[in-house]
Amino acid sequence: MVRSGKNGDLHLKQIAYYKRTGEYHPTTLPSERSGIRRAAKKFVFKEKKKVLRECHENDTGAHHGISRTLTLVESSYYWTSVTNDVKQWVYACQHCQVAKNTVILAPKQHLLKVENPWSIVTVDLMGPFHTSNRSHVYAIIMTDLFTKWVVILPLCDVSASEISKAIINIFFLYGPPQKIIMDQRDEFIHQINVELCELFGTKQIVISHASQTINPAESTPSTIKTFLSKHCVDYPNDWDDHLPAVSFAFNVTHLEPTKNTPYFQMFNRNPYMPESSDIREVDGDNTSMFAKILDAIKEADKIMENKTTSVGQMENNNCHELNKSKIIVKKKPKQQNPFHLKVGHEVLRQRKNWWKDGRFRSEWVGPCVIDYITENGGAVLRDSSGARLKRPIKMSHLKPYVRESGEQDSLHLLHGSVVADHDYVGMPELPVGAYQASILVEDAAIGVDDSELLTSSKDRELLEYRNAKISPLMEDHNALEKQTFSLLDSSNQVLEYLT
């Protein structure tokens, strides 16, 4: 048990100072020297690694995380830098770095808010359908997110020029919106934006669905998609002639949560509709096409409402049962540390198709050294033997490799011999001990500089001597060349003298 001083604090700093230097700390009182000498006999710094290894590794072969390892260490041992030492030990564990799989979390999505009619619309493509008499095969559906107003137009194909012409025709009727959200690849959206800029003068009005998150209930209703698919099968030759009637019938019948139709939401009034008998009776007992479409859409709405009600009741019952049996605990999502990798950093690379070999196969291979960075952002690596890998690796498939503090001294000379003869395209090389703190973000606090890990005066002198000897070898390549040429000249003179 370590005695406390007059102020009640432990003499850990004084004991460590006496243990390393053999002298008393300047703040040590004369009355405390005997207690510090006795306590220093019980302190053995070499046992710290043994304690960390025993607490980190389980008897079954499993490796604990930071919190569990720290709990086990603090239950039986104590020293001043126990938290930082545990973090450094866990992050530098070879088994944990290679065996731990990456957990990629989707970024937090913010729902898009729409406050005005015809400000933000979505565009969906449907088809291919049966070729109509006018050679139409596809259909484009434009839906206003605020009013749910729907416009449907036929298309001959799904090229960027054909879609742009259809969008321009809708612009001439209702005006251009602020944004158009489309679920297509970025290259195709770029082509549509170029076509719209040439035809109408708008720039970057169409955006990707991935860049903006919308509520699924605000997108194109599934009712109209289901109805349109069935209607095109029932009328394979003239389905494109009925698209204006389908969109109008949907806009005047589909009720919103506000109990208003999309037509009323769009124009702030209801359209003039003739009597139902006038709509249905045309030329005697024949029913008009619009009346058939209107009845079919109403039936489809009723079916969807019944399905939604039944599904909602089942979900509520399931949630109620789960709430009774379980207590939901809200957990904070894990945060990924963004890595800033540069030339000279030691990294682990992700194994290609590692999941096909079984879940017990390690995901990461290494360590490797970043030789240089290509113009496309790929990293060319060298393995531990100094051989360069054939293909560049994406930065997203790399993560920093953390070594123990004792391994960094011998590793620095290896890095110099491997990468000193190469002209870098990317950033200049860095010493091994210095780059670990710059790779990781500040919140992680797992990279520690060599000067912070080496606390004794002898270790600091060794570090300064090592940096003083290595830095000329890493930086001044011209000096090495001059020395080499001077040795060659002297050897040539000796050979001439002998001959």
From Swiss-Prot:
Per its UniProt record, what Gene3D superfamilies does this chain match? 1.10.340.70, Ribonuclease H-like superfamily/Ribonuclease H
GO MF annotations, alphabetized: nucleic acid binding
Domain (Integrase catalytic) ranges: 113-270
Which Pfam families does this entry report, sorted A to Z? Integrase_H2C2, rve
The biological process GO terms on file are: DNA integration
- PROSITE patterns in the record, alphabetically? INTEGRASE (PS50994)
Q: Which domain of life is it from?
A: Eukaryota
Q: Which residues form a coiled coil?
A: none
Protein name per UniProt: Gypsy retrotransposon integrase-like protein 1
Q: Which organism is it from?
A: Bos taurus
Where is the organism placed in the taxonomic lineage, from the top?
Eukaryota, Metazoa, Chordata, Craniata, Vertebrata
Which gene is this protein's source?
GIN1
